Amino acid sequence: MKAVILTKPTESTEVKIAEYPTPAVKPGWVLVRIKSFGMNHSEQILRKSEISAPYIQKPIIPGIECVGEIADASDTAFTAGQKVIAFMGGMGREFNGSYAEYALLPAHHVFAVDTNLSWDRLAAIPETYFTAWGSLFECLSLTSNDHLLVRGGTCALGYAAIQIAKALGCKVTATTHRESKMQLLTDCGADTALLDNDSLKGQVLGITKALELVGIKTLKDTLSCMEKGGIVCNTGNLGGVYT
């Protein structure tokens, strides 16, 4: 099969597609024929630096999510040809991921779906919307009465969070560092779009929940914007600051 294979830190211009053995099935794992996959910031981090970490399998095929069909169900309850999605749980780090024609995946990380969405549209959903859902409901316990701040709203995760929050009935304020992208936030459903200069204190009122996607760079400022008893979920690191 064809696959992207990493063994060391690699620039984007150095990424190459190579021949790699199609994995053999084993008990509890299924072979998925990859039809499409989303690309994530975490894969960029892996390619640039994390590949050097001792916990990363090497060589590794990156890719933390995919959509496709069951090619071989092994001893599981899946059936050949079944449409599935899979994401995270060690994909592209502990075992080979989705940047390939086939992926051997633990059956408990694979989910059957019944949809008429095209493969490329379906591939935009798994990791992004799963992360947004977990951040909003598992971490923030979001309700329709909340005023949600999405800090760094013009990334894929930000768009997903805005859409979910508005579907719930929340008031949503979202930010971007680029004036040219402010209209995208309101088109996505945000009630208010703000140009972010890394200091929102005094510009926003009534924020009860916040999804911090810029990261440590703006986290302290986000905390200063919260109403008493508010909750902040720091899910992203678009700002590139780690300490």
Language-model features: locations:
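NAD(P)H dinucleotide-binding glycine-rich loop of Rossmann-like/cofactor-binding domains
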Residues: 87-152
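Glycine-rich phosphate-binding loop and adjacent beta-alpha segment
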Residues: 185, 217-243
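Adenosine-nucleotide cofactor-binding segment
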Residues: 150, 166-221
